[in-house]
Amino acid sequence: KTTTTRLIAHIVKNNNYKVGFTTSDGIYIQNHMMEKGDTTGPISAEYILKDPNVEFAVLETARGGILRSGLGFKVCDIGVITNIQEDHLGLSDIHDLNDLARVKSVVVESVKKDGWAVLNGEDVHCLEIARSLSCNVALFSLDENCPAIVEHCAEGGIAAIYENGYITIKKGDWK
């Protein structure tokens, strides 16, 4: 999640936005560390969202923070779930991957109707979450022939795939 957060923040900053972001190692505004530590909870999100200089927020969100205090925001434009894996089990009432999927789904369920949920097309739990969303859905996969990606694009959906050493965006038959 931290790598994804940093990558998104870097891309947005290079498009001339003033970016604030939170990760498991700190709170940053324009790449300047404002606070060190695990800042993936709602208090850190509020820190970024209340800063008048921040034009674009990228907020890494951990399951523990969601369980304890929620997200720190009500709605967002884009929500990303990179995966749902067993290494995140064992906190509070999260005993299996279905429990974890329910917690992580809170992020993409907060996406505005005209916003985007970006989900792992190779993760069965992410695909299940996608079916219940009312926002736009984009999938990603390292496998250009991933069945979920093929089906999603055949239905006119958008996906990002790794193809011939490049990240390729697909929509329908278009690349």
Locations of regions flagged by a protein language model:
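Short polybasic amphipathic segments
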Residues: 25-29, 160, 165-174
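Conserved catalytic and cofactor-binding micro-motifs
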Residues: 154-159
